[in-house]
């Protein structure tokens, strides 16, 4: 018997083709997508508006399978981090509630190949790309856990950011269909302004993105000059800052999802990239690119060669940029008591080691604390 097809690997259009091949009406795909994503259903028997004969046929050839939660950790600030089981490995998904929204940070790869020196995920190295079902399945599983707001009191997901483990633009074949499902009114129906793809600067893929999908864009810049960026974001050696910003401006010229602006992400590293001179250089780099700048206090991880910028250095950096007229925010660190903060996602390899050590110390698996 051939392997069953996971319907979570299919966009609604692909599912319509699947039903045609089964000799069924394409509208059945619309029904299935609604059942899977609107109602969180993964059991064909519970799909009451689909006749029993078709349900039995589907059970023979298809399945609905999302990653399972291996470990759940809840922060004192409401952030939840899940280690999701994907095959024999794990990736991490983070739920971040705020007063007016709730953002889900989703992984696109097991590990990451880009080797950014300040990021714990990069220290794990790259293992493989996630499939469509493993990406959209993170959203499905999180939505299932969060449940009904009226019952659980947990705010439903309003935004999805592809800012978890991995470089999304190195897995476009799976990331783009997953985002299509996020945007599909029959699935999650998120606005394209509420789905964000983040990249460290894979320029050829970024140039292709507008032909495939229109979503909000964030750029992990982190340095204002090529010499420094070559060191801390090594992909810059291949696609330098000018090449990247030219590509960003091309994307903005055709995108409707960004309000005409890109988000620039900038992790502040003490006495590395957080000086006033760096702020002036950054202002010069961004002067021709409509943007908002998100400054991110660095989140420490074991054996990292960096320190966190002081509040005074962060404030000075922000004020310098604001004097140029930029909109500049400082990201509030969320979930750092469970290593769910930006740059701390390391998945099974590192987390498992840390959890084991804590288990020996405290006799139970607890939220990971910064060392």
From Swiss-Prot:
A biological-process GO annotation: rRNA base methylation
Cystine bridges: which residues?
Answer: 105-342
For [4Fe-4S] cluster, which residues are the binding ones? 112, 116, 119
**Compartments, record wording:** Cytoplasm
What GO MF annotations does this protein's record show?
A: 4 iron, 4 sulfur cluster binding; metal ion binding; rRNA (adenine(2503)-C2-)-methyltransferase activity; rRNA binding; tRNA (adenine(37)-C2)-methyltransferase activity; tRNA binding
The cofactors required by this protein are: [4Fe-4S] cluster
- Alphabetized UniProt keyword annotations: 4Fe-4S, Cytoplasm, Disulfide bond, Iron, Iron-sulfur, Metal-binding, Methyltransferase, rRNA processing, S-adenosyl-L-methionine, Transferase, tRNA processing
Looking at its record, which EC class is this enzyme? Answer: transferase
**Annotated catalytic residues:** 92, 342
According to UniProt, the reaction catalysed is: adenosine(2503) in 23S rRNA + 2 reduced [2Fe-2S]-[ferredoxin] + 2 S-adenosyl-L-methionine = 2-methyladenosine(2503) in 23S rRNA + 5'-deoxyadenosine + L-methionine + 2 oxidized [2Fe-2S]-[ferredoxin] + S-adenosyl-L-homocysteine; adenosine(37) in tRNA + 2 reduced [2Fe-2S]-[ferredoxin] + 2 S-adenosyl-L-methionine = 2-methyladenosine(37) in tRNA + 5'-deoxyadenosine + L-methionine + 2 oxidized [2Fe-2S]-[ferredoxin] + S-adenosyl-L-homocysteine
The record's family statement is: Belongs to the radical SAM superfamily. RlmN family.
The record's listing under HAMAP family reads: RNA_methyltr_RlmN (MF_01849)
Q: What is this protein called?
A: Dual-specificity RNA methyltransferase RlmN
- Organism in which the protein naturally occurs: Actinobacillus succinogenes (strain ATCC 55618 / DSM 22257 / CCUG 43843 / 130Z)
């Amino acid at each position: 018997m051939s392997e069953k097809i996971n319907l979570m690997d299919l966009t609604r259009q692909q599912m319509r083709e699947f039903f045609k091949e089964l000799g069924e009406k394409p509208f059945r795909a619309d029904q299935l997508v609604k059942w899977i994503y609107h109602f969180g259903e993964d059991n064909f028997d519970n799909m009451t508006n689909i006749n029993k004969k078709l349900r039995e046929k589907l059970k023979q050839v298809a399945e609905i399978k999302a990653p399972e939660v291996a470990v759940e950790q809840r922060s004192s600030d409401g952030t939840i981090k899940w280690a999701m089981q994907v095959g024999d490995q794990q990736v991490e998904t983070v739920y971040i509630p705020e007063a007016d929204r709730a953002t889900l940070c989703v992984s696109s790869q097991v590990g990451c190949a880009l080797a950014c020196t300040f990021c714990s995920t990069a220290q794990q190295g790259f293992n493989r790309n996630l499939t469509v079902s493993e990406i959209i399945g993170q959203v499905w599983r999180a939505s299932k856990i969060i449940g009904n707001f009226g019952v659980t009191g947990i705010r439903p997901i309003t935004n999805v950011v592809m800012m978890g483990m991995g470089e999304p633009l190195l897995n476009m074949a799976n990331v783009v269909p997953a985002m299509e499902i996020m945007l599909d009114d029959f699935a999650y129906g998120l606005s394209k302004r509420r789905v964000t793809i983040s990249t460290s600067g894979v320029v050829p893929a970024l140039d292709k993105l507008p032909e495939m999908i229109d979503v909000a864009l964030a750029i992990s810049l982190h340095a204002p000059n090529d010499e420094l960026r070559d060191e801390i974001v090594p992909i810059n050696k291949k696609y330098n800052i000018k090449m990247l910003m030219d590509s960003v401006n091309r994307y903005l010229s055709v995108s409707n999802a960004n309000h005409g602006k890109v988000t620039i992400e900038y992790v502040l590293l003490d006495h590395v990239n957080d000086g006033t001179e760096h702020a002036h250089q950054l202002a010069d780099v961004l002067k021709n690119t409509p943007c908002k700048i998100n400054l991110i206090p660095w989140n420490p991880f074991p054996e990292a060669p960096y320190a966190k910028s002081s509040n005074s250095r962060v404030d000075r950096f922000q004020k310098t940029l604001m004097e140029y007229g930029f909109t500049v925010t400082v990201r509030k660190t969320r979930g750092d008591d469970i290593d769910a903060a930006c740059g701390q996602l390391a998945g099974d390899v590192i987390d498992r080691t840390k959890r084991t050590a804590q288990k020996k110390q405290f006799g139970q698996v607890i939220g990971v604390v910064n060392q």
